[in-house]
């Protein structure tokens, strides 16, 4: 990777380039309240479920735990999108690929955990027995190790992002052209994973998981553990992203977003900065996918659909780009609405999503968070 160069006096030599200020979006009280709210969701909810009977109105149902856990995974993806789009100005329509890669890596481990409890009583996953395979493919070599799985969840999305990003950024592909090729990448990967011979379960993908770390995966305690782990991961990534965007590295990213050519004239190397944040955002999505799969119980090539990547961008736009909190809020708003509309009025969901994106683009260019800021400034 090309490491960002950091000449000591380059910015002083070109006074026309001014890095964005470090003024925070929210006051210290606002940040504290947001972080406390996340901690409360992660800590109070499981405690209430332990102490309160299921008949209590404050007891979270299994459905609610799974839904909130899933939305928190989506919120991590939205936060990753904010780093690459909101703060660096690079619109990716392929982040669903990195989410799915992380999910598939975790899914491979969970399939190996089934062991002899599968329908065919074989050490091979059921779909391999059905296809009359005799041995595991080479890319399943480390899938029975949890430690190796954790490493691959980070390394595989990061490596794919690095290779793709290096050639794309080196070729100076920008704007809508970059968005198009990222969408083409995830579409090509989806078609590849649909093929049975690739060893990823074909169109059915992976499902029917039974254990994780040799513990039953469907018990209420395990579901709550995964829920808490997801919330803590979201909180950790949020704090990391906040530190990153307020650092000198983050201010250079914002300068690249606003005036990349002038940043180059100042002696900085945009390639290294863009590639670094691109890989970081891809790894975040991979981790989100790995947390998502054991909670929903399935992963298939449909997760790589270009529509899913577009939705990630919509979450960031609805909440408000370059705000950190905004994309998280947007993920909760959009997916909360989706969980209701797809049940009550399933035929209207795509129309609603399209109208929501158009409305935000025309009337709320800074998203919900921007509207709140404007309202507060007017008081």
Short names for language-model regions:
Residues 2-379:
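Transmembrane alpha-helices and adjacent helix-loop boundaries
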């Amino acid at each position: 990777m090309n490491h960002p160069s950091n000449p000591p006096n380059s910015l002083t030599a070109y006074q026309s380039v001014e890095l964005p200020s470090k003024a925070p979006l929210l006051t210290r009280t606002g940040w504290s309240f947001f972080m406390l709210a996340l901690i409360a969701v992660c800590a109070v909810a499981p405690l209430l479920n332990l102490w309160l009977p299921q008949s209590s109105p404050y007891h979270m149902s299994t459905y609610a735990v799974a839904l909130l856990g899933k939305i928190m995974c989506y919120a991590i993806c939205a936060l990753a999108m904010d780093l690459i789009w909101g703060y660096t100005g690079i619109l990716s329509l392929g982040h669903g690929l990195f989410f799915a890669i992380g999910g598939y890596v975790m899914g491979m481990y969970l399939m190996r955990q089934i062991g002899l409890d599968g329908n065919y009583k074989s050490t091979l996953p059921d779909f391999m027995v059905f296809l009359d395979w005799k041995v595991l493919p080479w890319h399943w070599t480390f899938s029975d190790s949890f430690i190796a799985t954790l490493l691959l969840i980070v390394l595989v999305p990061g490596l794919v992002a690095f290779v793709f990003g290096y050639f794309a950024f080196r070729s100076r592909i920008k704007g809508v052209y970059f968005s198009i090729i990222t969408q083409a990448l995830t579409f090509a990967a989806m078609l590849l994973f649909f093929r049975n011979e690739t060893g990823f379960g074909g169109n059915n993908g992976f499902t029917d998981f039974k254990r994780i770390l040799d513990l039953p995966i469907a018990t209420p305690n395990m579901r709550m553990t995964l829920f808490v782990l997801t919330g803590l991961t979201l909180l950790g990534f949020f704090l990391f992203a906040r530190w990153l965007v307020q650092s000198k590295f983050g201010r250079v990213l914002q300068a690249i977003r606003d005036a990349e050519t002038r940043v180059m004239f100042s002696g900085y190397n945009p390639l290294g900065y863009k590639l670094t944040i691109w890989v970081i955002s891809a790894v975040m999505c991979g981790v989100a996918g790995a947390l998502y799969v054991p909670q929903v119980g399935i992963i298939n090539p449909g997760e790589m659909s270009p529509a899913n990547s577009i939705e990630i961008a919509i979450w960031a736009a609805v909440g408000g780009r370059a705000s950190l909190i905004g994309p998280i809020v947007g993920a909760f708003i959009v997916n909360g609405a989706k969980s209701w509309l797809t049940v009550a009025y399933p035929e209207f969901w795509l129309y609603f999503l399209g109208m929501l994106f158009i409305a935000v683009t025309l009337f709320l260019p800074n998203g919900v968070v921007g509207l709140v800021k404007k309202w507060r400034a007017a008081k």
